[in-house]
Amino acid sequence: MLVIDAGQPRNRFAEHAHGFFGQDGKPPARIVADAAAQLAAYPTVQRIAGETRTAERDASGRFHVTLADGSRASADRLILATGIRDVLPALPGLAERWGVSVLHCPYCHGYEVSDRQLGVLATHPLSVHQAILIPDWGPTTWFTQRIVEPNEEEAALLDARGVRIERSPVVEILGDAPRIDALRLADGQVVPIDALFIGARTEMASDLAQQLGCAFDEGPLGVAIRVDTWKQTSIPGVFAAGDASSLMTNATFASASGVAAGVGAHRSLIFGLDA
């Protein structure tokens, strides 16, 4: 088995990983390094560093990939664990705080910022759901950015949850990065905030699935490669795992789907692609 690792995990911006059973509190780079060391114990596995640029399936059903350095590799089965990228809003001061004080998931990072002043920055209509959830971790202000207005039911929930609503757009994040001290609004207000949650839109981190002709499912924040129970895509012999193949993303889900894809790929080599 050949593993081609581009070295660009989605969570590389975070100081520590959370919500990943058995790995809680570890830096993402350490998790990857530990995994690489464990793989090295298996003589049937080869791991190389590199970026895969192209992938194709020949008439016999065999797959061929080309790396950025021009080298090529071929295989009977292909597992895409190419991941996704978070598309951040163009707000001054946001990118340099991503993964530290600007966060995407309360289930991954909520405990670490609990009982502090929390904010939710709207980037799409579903951000109202995040604003309703976040008060379980601390006092919450929802910044609508004039993107969305709550309906009657949502407004009642926000009120019941004690969420403060600010409709004047956030124009700047204040404080020594990666820390946040406050948010400056267009109307001149400065609102103290310790951590800011954003449900960022996402995009594929690689176009390999598109090159191969894989089907996709549309989600509220982006797309995911369509897979079956064994993580096989719409292209026979191509499997997908991790955030690229799920509309609900988390390191534990990604790891579990990798197990399913590996088992599915192996079973297909023994029993055939239709088994």
Question: Across the structure, where does each feature detected by a protein language model lie?
Answer:
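Phosphate-coordination loops involved in phosphoryl transfer and adenosine-cofactor binding
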Residues: 49-50, 114-116, 235
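Short, well-ordered coil/turn residues at beta-beta hairpins
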Residues: 75, 81-83, 88-90, 121, ...
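A Rossmann-like FAD-binding core segment of flavoenzymes
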Residues: 33-67, 72-75, 138-223, 270-274
